[in-house]
A protein has these predicted regions:
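Helix-loop boundary and gating motifs at the non-cytosolic
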Residues: 2-57, 203-248
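Hydrophobic core of transmembrane alpha-helices in multi-pass small-molecule transporters
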Residues: 20, 102-118, 217, 297-310
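Intracellular juxtamembrane helix-capping segments at the cytosolic ends
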Residues: 33, 117-131, 230, 310-323
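Helix-to-loop junctions at the C-terminal end of transmembrane segments
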Residues: 61-74, 162, 256-270, 353
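C-terminal ends and interior cores of transmembrane alpha-helices
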Residues: 83-99, 280-292
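Cytoplasmic helix-loop-helix junction between adjacent transmembrane helices
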Residues: 108-149
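C-terminal transmembrane helical hairpin of 12-TM major facilitator-type secondary transporters
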Residues: 271-313
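A late C-terminal transmembrane helix in Major Facilitator Superfamily
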Residues: 326-356
């Protein structure tokens, strides 16, 4: 199913726009928390702990949110999380301005993470139910395209707000905008407005779901390793400002990859697609160890982004097959696995960089991708042919 047909489904264009607005804090919140907490406490370590608390909260919250969505529907979960998320961030800003204790900022950051609204999860559920199986590749690609755009635009808008105001005011404004977008998005839902009649199943009835989570964890490791490797490389080259351009290369590649991947039908089995995409990702990232010129580095990262988002899309397609009776919770576990993998990847990349130099994190990223490909290939032995 081409994108033109998906855009013709009533409500989808509005949901995509509102979903974009609602996800502005996805990337902004951790950065904003660091800036606000560091200014209040004077310690980067304490600010980092607050940001880590946000990430931990987000990882803990996703499966719970998904289970509630399976049982109660999307709207009440979105409304509740929007209020919790915005209230916690505004309380954090106020507490920091008042010079409150740092541990309370960490607690508020954790609460903000727990309440991070499950927008992309809701979009997958909504569009998956309203669009036939033949259109799921395009629908899930559009989900990641919208998310990637929000992750690209959000920090830029945040930076502009900081330039004209302050980090505290900027974080508060972005939080309010995201909260309003979430509430508007929840009202725009149609199929996801009520709980699915199937939504009381068990996530891990099919044990292949556990294998898929392990694959996605390794894919998250790729992302985490790159998050450490890119600023380290730019700093080592004496051009720390180039970090933004390198991150943008990966994001732009992800946008282009999601758009291209969803624009056509694929004849390969879904399991084979996932293994193949991760293999290509690993082979693309491995040469970064040898690349010297930053422009060439940018081009290789763009190529990596071209397959990164399609790999995430393909993992979502397998959720349709492995956990059809508890999709929202399963998607929540996918998000948690990506976050856990990101933490592991960041840690591994940091150790590799200290031991072997600033290029080593990219070898770690490639190793995560190749390991994910090998593990995904085991799904071929028991998997059924894909139908999307």
């Amino acid at each position: 199913m081409p994108y033109s047909e998906i855009r013709g489904v009533p409500g989808v264009p509005a949901q995509a726009v509102l979903g974009f607005l609602a996800q502005l804090t996805q990337q902004v919140a951790p950065v904003g928390i660091v800036l606000v907490a560091q200014r209040a406490s004077g310690s980067l370590a304490l600010a980092g702990a607050a940001a880590a608390a946000f990430s931990v909260g987000a990882g803990m919250g996703r499966p719970v949110q998904g289970r509630l969505m399976d049982r109660r529907g999307s709207r009440p979960v979105l409304a509740a999380t929007a209020l919790i998320h915005v209230a916690a961030l505004l309380a954090l800003v106020g507490w920091a301005q008042a010079g409150g204790a740092w541990w309370a900022m960490a607690v508020l950051s954790w609460v903000a993470g727990i309440g991070l609204p499950p927008i992309s999860l809701s979009m997958r559920i909504e569009w998956g139910r309203r669009i036939g199986a033949e259109g799921h590749t395009a629908a899930y690609s559009l989900v990641y395209l919208v998310q990637e755009l929000a992750m690209l635009v959000g920090p830029l808008a945040f930076g502009l707000l900081i330039a004209v105001a302050s980090s505290s005011l900027a974080l508060g404004l972005v939080a309010v905008a995201a909260g309003a977008g979430t509430l508007a998005f929840s009202l725009a839902l149609r199929a996801g407005a009520t709980a699915s009649s199937r939504g009381r199943g068990r996530v891990f009835t099919d044990r292949r779901m556990l294998v898929l989570l392990a694959v996605v964890l390794l894919l998250g490791g790729v992302i985490g390793a790159l998050q450490v490797g890119l600023p380290a490389l730019a700093a080592a080259r004496g051009a720390p400002a180039a970090t933004g351009l390198l991150v943008a290369a990966l994001s732009l590649g992800g946008i282009a990859g999601a758009a291209a991947y969803g624009a056509r039908s694929w004849g390969f089995r879904v399991q084979a697609r996932l293994a193949g995409l991760l293999l290509v990702l690993g082979l693309v990232l491995a040469p970064l160890v040898l690349v010297g010129a930053l422009p060439l580095f940018w081009a290789v990262l763009f190529a990596g982004g071209l397959v990164l988002n399609p790999a995430l899309t393909t993992a979502s397609l397998l959720v349709d097959e492995y956990a059809p009776a508890a999709q929202a919770e399963a998607f929540g576990w996918i998000s948690t696995s990506i976050g856990m993998g990101g933490a592991a990847g960041s840690a591994a990349a940091g150790v590799a960089g200290d031991l072997f130099g600033h290029s080593a994190p990219f070898l770690a990223a490639a190793a995560f991708a190749l390991g994910g490909s090998a593990l995904a290939s085991t799904l071929l032995r028991t998997g059924r042919p894909g139908t999307v």
